[in-house]
């Protein structure tokens, strides 16, 4: 097993280990296709794609595990709760961008205040849209609403 796990780039002072999982071409390809690392995406599209994914999966826990679970308004309460959390997250992203990016001479547009503002705006629109899409799916397709009940009851 020791021959499979080595210091990253044979430098023991880096602090990372090179394992078959972390240095495989499959792992690098999978991580390279995530919107955070994909080349050529504008900050707005990057935020939109990340926001859609987060908005889509945030509604489920609020719907199935929230205080109004099992009632007729659980799905609506879950949707509104997820939108509330999205607004809080967007506010935090905006505050982070305002204090972190004061220079505008970076090569990466996401590392500037304007680029981070575009990312934040894309995140807000994408997350609310993803949450709304999940709400519409759950409200209009009954088999999706009851699919996860066996996990929590």
Curated annotation (Swiss-Prot):
Family: Belongs to the PsaL family.
Lumenal topological domain: 94-118
UniProt topological domain (Stromal) ranges: 1-72, 140-153
Keyword Membrane tagged: yes
Transmembrane regions listed in the UniProt entry: 73-93, 119-139
Keyword terms, alphabetized: Chloroplast, Membrane, Photosynthesis, Photosystem I, Plastid, Thylakoid, Transmembrane, Transmembrane helix
Record's bilayer topology term: Multi-pass membrane protein
GO cellular component, one term: photosystem I reaction center
Gene for this chain: psaL
Signal peptide extent: none
GO BP annotation list: photosynthesis
Record protein name field: Photosystem I reaction center subunit XI
Cited InterPro entries: PSI_PsaL, PSI_PsaL_sf, PSI_suXI
Source organism per UniProt: Porphyra purpurea (Red seaweed)
Principal location listed in the UniProt entry: plastid
Subcellular location per the Swiss-Prot or TrEMBL entry: Plastid, Chloroplast thylakoid membrane
PANTHER family in the cross-refs: PHOTOSYSTEM I REACTION CENTER SUBUNIT XI, CHLOROPLASTIC
Pfam families per UniProt: PsaL (PF02605)
């Amino acid at each position: 097993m020791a021959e499979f796990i080595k210091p990253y780039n044979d430098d023991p002072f880096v602090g990372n280990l090179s394992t078959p999982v972390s240095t495989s071409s499959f792992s690098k390809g999978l991580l390279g296709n995530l919107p955070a690392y994909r080349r050529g995406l504008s900050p707005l599209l990057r935020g939109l794609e990340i926001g859609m994914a987060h908005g889509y999966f945030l509604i489920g826990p609020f719907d199935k595990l929230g205080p109004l679970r099992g009632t007729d308004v659980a799905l609506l309460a879950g949707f509104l709760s997820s939108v509330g959390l999205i607004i809080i997250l967007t506010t935090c992203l905006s505050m982070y961008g305002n204090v972190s990016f004061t220079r505008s001479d970076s090569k990466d547009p996401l590392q500037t205040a304007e680029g981070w503002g575009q990312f934040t705006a894309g995140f807000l629109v994408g997350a609310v849209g993803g949450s709304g899409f999940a709400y519409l799916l759950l409200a209009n397709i009954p088999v999706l609403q009851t699919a996860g009940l066996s996990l929590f009851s």
